[in-house]
Amino acid sequence: MIDLTAEQQQLAKIVHEYASQFPPTENGDAQLLQGCYDYMEAFKRVMDSASKVQMDYICLQYPGYFRFAKWMERLAQGIADGVIEVPKDH
């Protein structure tokens, strides 16, 4: 087992449980995205504190965390590509 801190486990589980409550459908994805802001800080704290090996382990152990991560990646790519517009005051 990969050693995770108690905080990493707790935060990964919080994000996992949030993302897992929505069905893996287009509507479920929309619901996930509507409330994702409240979980971004926990998500980022895990990402910033985990090694690549730890992140791989977290994504295997917490599929909801992985789903959340994939959506954050898609959003970031959409913003970078100019497909998603971000208001200038953000």
Model segments located where?
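Residue-level detector of alpha-helical transmembrane segments in integral membrane proteins
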Residues: 2, 16-17, 56, 80
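Short acidic DE-rich linear segments
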Residues: 87-90
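Residue-level detector of alpha-helix boundary/anchor positions
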Residues: 1-4, 43
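Acidic, low-complexity, intrinsically disordered interaction modules
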Residues: 24-80
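Short terminal alpha-helical segments
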Residues: 3-27
